[in-house]
Structure formats: structure tokens, C-alpha cells
Amino acid sequence: MYEFVVNDRNYLNYRFFDNLNNEIMLPINPLNFKLFNNSFFDYDLINENITNVQQPVINDIPGVLILNKTFGKYKNKFLYKCVPYDTSLPIFLVPYKVVLGFNKETVNKYVRFSFLHWDDKHPIGELIECIGDVNNISSYYQYELVFRKLKYSIKSLQNNAFKQVKQINDATIEDIKTKYNCEDYTNSNKNYIFTIDPSDCKDFDDAVSINNNIINVYIANVAVWLDYFKLWEIMSDRVSTIYLPDSKISMLPTILSDDICSLRKNKKRFAICMSLVIKNNEIVDVSFKNTMIKVANNFVYDEDKLKKNKNYRELFNTLTNLKNTFNIKIKDSHDVIMYLMITMNYYCSLRLKKNKIGIFREVKIKDNDMNRDKISILPENIKTFYRLYRNVTANYTLEPGNYDSLHHDFLESYVHITSPIRRIVDLLNLIQFQTSENIYHFSNQAISFYDKWVNKLLKINLDMKSIRKLQRSEEHTSELQSHSDLVCR
């Protein structure tokens, strides 16, 4: 069989390949035979005809519906051109009924459509969903989610979680505390626990306390709730919370992310705790345990109330005097949290590496021959920009290796575990870490959930890359402007 590959929607640049993947010349016009990109077929040399055509499945296509001109009718609806986001697909005709508003303005639409048939010049499509107007920022982001294959339903998980949460009472909390071996840290006189986050934050997944020479870092134990409520099998395929200028698309239903799992003030919550013992300005011991905590305050970064808090001041002074802070200069509360999260990720990675399990973070600088001595003398803001600009590859892997990043160079291993409310990898590492450290052995459903995602590590990396692209504001602005230019009157 032969394969047809096209690079533009006008079919001006296309190629044919044989079954050995060798490029060949065939005397056929792909438009005459209505071939889509990546179609396979047999070629009859004598009759100059193609047979056994195997077209790719085209059942959910994002595109822009152009409403300034009609092209006939199909089943009592006018046909309009629809330009697919995928530039390898030709322009379709899609039936649509225009509804004029008060101002009589016809605005092009972001849509999802499917392929029906291709009998004439343009293939015919069928509308699946009208996402919204091209000059609407929310519609644009929904359109991008569809194209980047990041639109996953959490309806089943949301409904089930809501039913479970409604039944939570004091007995439930005590049952979880006992079952998951959680030490009681809810006495604020002994453990003044607080969070530091942006002002609009609701999904608090990390907290901290300090008591003399011991710093405790607490991470929301999302795995405990999912395990207790038996939610593993209905988890969605979302790999991360997505932060957009106009909204947040949570990895978990908000009843979990912003409420039950979130380390909210004055609420009993479950967290895995890392204890750092400080002596002579060095970390001399690190230990982990499951805890039940009650946060005393949800602070905002650098607010006056935080700066005046004696516990925060003690924490800040202790960290600024530490001898090793992974090249992080601790100047404010942002640096405090950054250092503590890096520290926990690092020490957890050492344990996971020793036990030969876990999902590790691998980040490489594009220029491996970069002269670090010269870079080190640059002003901090320029150095940050330079290294962030050069940093182009970041993946998750099952193999621990050198971790090269903006603030902490060449750690022998590194994992993400401190944001389990927001990232699937952190949740997966949280499961394995507790198992490997004999903190708690989760259910078979939890282990199956972990194994399923380990086998889909490529998908995690691809989706995370797509999410990073989607969150780049510069790209949003230019794309939205180009689509808004298509507004018709």
C-alpha cells in the first residue's frame, strides 16, 4: 500500500510513500481522489486508479466557521466554509443557521465538527458544537483546549466526589486518621501551621511550621482521600490544572481541589509531613510521616500580616542562615516557599531513587557548553532570563538523572511531589513514596492507577508540553487577534 502525506490545506505540497517508507512519484491528483492526510491506498498502474482507500478517522475537528458568504444548502441549512485548525486538512463546508443578535453583526465562530462525506470540491462536515465567537477570549481558550486535545470530562468524578463529601462527619475524619496512620498535629499551640500563597489561591496544597530547630513541611495527602472514597477508577485523563488569564481548569473537581484536599484554615486535613532537623545552620536529619493537621492561617505572599507573624519571622531567619539553599537567595516569602518545595522534592527523590521507583523530572539546558562562570557574574534578573530562555527540554522519566534548572544545579535526582492537587505526576509519586517508605500501603486500585499512568508517561509529557504552550500569553494574544480579524458584518 501507499501513503499520502500533505502539508497544506490547498494540497500544493504533498508526497507519496511506499510500504518501505520510501518517497515515490505517482501520477495522480490527490484532490481528484478525495484523499486526506495520512490516507493509505493501493494503486492500479494499468488503469491509473486507486483502490482499497483507508482514510484516517476524522470525527472531532476544531475549526473556524466563516459566516460572510454561503455556498449552497444542505438539509435546509446554508453551507459555510469552515477552516480547520489542522493545516493539513482542506477547507470544509458545514451547514449552520445564523442567528442575528440585536446589533446585526455576524461574527465567525469557533466550532467542533465531524466529517460526513467528500463528493464535490469541498468535503462536507457536520457541526458537533459551536464553542463561541472568535472575538471572545473564553471561547478562544476552549477552542485551544479542543485542538490541543486537553479537554477531558470530570463529570463522573465530580458527581461521585460530591456525594462522598456530603457524608463526611467527625467520625469519617477519625476513621481516616486511624486507617492511614496519621499523627495528630491539630494542636496549634504545639504546631502553628500556616500556608503562603497568592491572594486568589483556593487549592492550598502545601503548608509549613517551625518549632525551635525543626521545620515541618506539609503536603496535602490527596491520595488518602481518593483511596478512602474509592475514586481511582473514575479519575479523568487530566494531567494538570491549567491556569488561564480568565479562568482555572482544575485537574480535580473543585469540591476536592478547593475544599476537601485543600489545606484551608481551621479545617482538619491530611498531609504528608517532612521534618527537617536544623543544627549549626545545616540540615542534619530528614524524616517523613502521615499527619492530620489544622492550618492556623492562610497567608498571602509578602503581606504585612505575614511579615509580622513571629513564626514566619523565625522560619525566614532560620532559612536565611542555612549553609546550603540550592543557590536560592532567600529574600522574601516567595523564596521561602520555593526553597522548601525544592527541598522536599529533592529529599523525596533520593528515597525514591534508592528504592528504584517513582517518576523523575529531567530538565536540560539547550547549550550544554554554557560558560557558567561568565553567566554567574550577570545581574540576577538577566541571568534568570538567559537561563529560562535556554531551558527548552523538560520531561518526566522513570530514570533518575542530573537535574539542571534555574535555581538548583546538577542535583543527582529530582521529582515533583509537592503539588498533588494540581499535577498528576505529584499524585503518582505521593502514592509510591508512601508505599516505599512504609508510611502506608495503598489499595490495589491505587496501584493499578499508578501503573496505568506509568504506561502513559509519553501522554503526560505531551499534554504537559501542550499546557505550557497554551499558558503562554503572547501566543494567546496573537492567535486571538488573527481570528478576530475574521469578524464579518
Task: Give residue ranges: language-model regions.
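Conserved catalytic alpha/beta cores of large enzymes that bind or transform nucleotide phosphates
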Residues: 241-328
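Append "with occasional cross-activation on large, charged helical scaffolds in nucleic-acid assemblies
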Residues: 288-291, 301-478, 489
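Short acidic-glycine loop/turn motifs at beta-strand connectors
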Residues: 47, 211-212, 277-283, 355
